[in-house]
Amino acid sequence: MSDRIYLTKQGYNRMRDELNLLKTVVRKEVLEKIAEARAHGDLSENAEYEAAREQQAQMESKIVDLENKLTRASILDPKQIRTDRVYILTSVKLRNLDETDDEIIEYTLVSSEEADTDQGKISVRSPVGKALIGKAVGEKVQIHVPKGELHYEILEIFVK
């Protein structure tokens, strides 16, 4: 897969730091567990050894995945993001048209790698993200989600 991944500087640094931790600290710890399990003798019935090997495989897979993503990453400068329409790294204020209390919701659209719904960061590939991309202030959007349909009006587009 050679698709570009658009990240904030913080997102890129977080991934780079995680990769560094896996390669320097975690890899060493896992190799020590494997060596310790080997010392217990017969490997054919050694659950500790099998668990350590499984942990090693998962860790190596994560390392390859992070290296791949960092190779494909482009760091976006928030100062260069336009706010005439909803794009990756823009934040939007939405009015929930399905509620009678004029509920206002705020999201920031990010790559899948940086999505964190607890912080209001949603993926541009999510149903909400896909529905918002390219829209302008004042537009109404209908979003198909597993629970049904949501209806919002875009009130504001800005960069944090």
Swiss-Prot record:
It comes from Prosthecochloris aestuarii (strain DSM 271 / SK 413). GO terms for molecular function: DNA binding; RNA polymerase binding. Gene3D superfamilies: Transcription elongation factor, GreA/GreB, C-terminal domain (3.10.50.30), Transcription elongation factor, GreA/GreB, N-terminal domain (1.10.287.180). The keyword Methyltransferase does not apply. GO terms for biological process: DNA-templated transcription elongation; regulation of DNA-templated transcription elongation. Pfam families: GreA_GreB, GreA_GreB_N. InterPro entries: GreA/GreB_C_sf (IPR036953), TF_GreA/GreB_CS (IPR018151), Tscrpt_elong_fac_GreA (IPR006359), Tscrpt_elong_fac_GreA/B (IPR028624), Tscrpt_elong_fac_GreA/B_C (IPR001437), Tscrpt_elong_fac_GreA/B_fam (IPR023459), Tscrpt_elong_fac_GreA/B_N (IPR022691), Tscrpt_elong_fac_GreA/B_N_sf (IPR036805). Residues 43-75 form a coiled coil. This is Transcription elongation factor GreA. HAMAP family: GreA_GreB. Belongs to the GreA/GreB family. PANTHER family: TRANSCRIPTION ELONGATION FACTOR GREA (PTHR30437:SF4). It comes from the Bacteria. Transmembrane segments: none annotated. Necessary for efficient RNA polymerase transcription elongation past template-encoded arresting sites. The arresting sites in DNA have the property of trapping a certain fraction of elongating RNA polymerases that pass through, resulting in locked ternary complexes. Cleavage of the nascent transcript by cleavage factors such as GreA or GreB allows the resumption of elongation from the new 3'terminus. GreA releases sequences of 2 to 3 nucleotides. Keywords: Coiled coil, DNA-binding, Transcription, Transcription regulation.
